[in-house]
Amino acid sequence: MAEPGLEGSQPVDLSKHPSGIVPTLQNIVSTVNLDCKLDLKAIALQARNAEYNPKRFAAVIMRIREPKTTALIFASGKMVCTGAKSEQQSKLAARKYARIIQKLGFPAKFKDFKIQNIVGSCDVKFPIRLEGLAYSHGAFSSYEPELFPGLIYRMKQPKIVLLIFVSGKIVLTGAKVREETYTAFENIYPVLSEFRKIQQ
C-alpha cells in the first residue's frame, strides 16, 4: 500500500496540486510526553537498541527498524521521534518506543503527541535563476552562495522555510500539517517558473 504523497503511486489531484507536483515527505519530527520520570542509565543497559552518553547528550538515543526512526528519550519523560516519512508512521513509532519503555518497567503513558515539523522535498525539473529571485523577493530571501549553495526563502503564509537550489530541487521545512507543505509549494511554484533559467 503506497503512502499518500509518494510520487508515481497515484495520479495527482490537480485541484489540490495545480502545479502537478506533490512534495514528498522526507522526515517527520514529533514529540510525546511519557508522563513519568525515567532512569536513562537503566534504559540504556536493558534496551538492545539504545545508546546513552550523558557527557555528550542528556538523552537516550534509541532506534527501531519499522518504522525506521530514532527517538531521543529524556529523564523527564519527554520524547522526540524523528525519521518517519508520514504522520501516521511517526505516531506508530512513538507508540512503539513508549511500549519498549513500559516493558522495561516504567509506568509510561502517551500524552500530548504532537507533530512538530514536517520536511518535504520535490524537484521542479528546471533550473532556477537564484540571483534574480533573491533580488526581486529580497524581503523573504537570503542567498549567499559562498556560504550555502541554496536560496533560503522564508514564507510568511504559511510559515514555511524553503531551500531552493539552482538545479530545481526544493526542500520545505517548518510545517505542522502536510497541507502547509503543499500550500507553500503551490505558492512558490509560479515564482520559480518566472525565474526559470533558459538553457543555452
Swiss-Prot record:
Keywords: DNA-binding, Nucleus, Repeat, Transcription
Swiss-Prot/TrEMBL Sequence repeat ranges: 25-101, 115-192
Compartments, as annotated in UniProt: Nucleus
GO molecular function: DNA binding; RNA polymerase II general transcription initiation factor activity
Pfam families found in the cross-reference section: TBP (PF00352)
Highest taxon listed in the record's lineage: Eukaryota
GO process annotations (BP): DNA-templated transcription initiation
Annotated Gene Ontology cellular component terms: nucleus
Subunit structure: Belongs to the TFIID complex together with the TBP-associated factors (TAFs). Binds DNA as monomer.
Entry similarity comment: Belongs to the TBP family.
Cited function: General transcription factor that functions at the core of the DNA-binding multiprotein factor TFIID. Binding of TFIID to the TATA box is the initial transcriptional step of the pre-initiation complex (PIC), playing a role in the activation of eukaryotic genes transcribed by RNA polymerase II.
Protein name (database record): TATA-box-binding protein 2
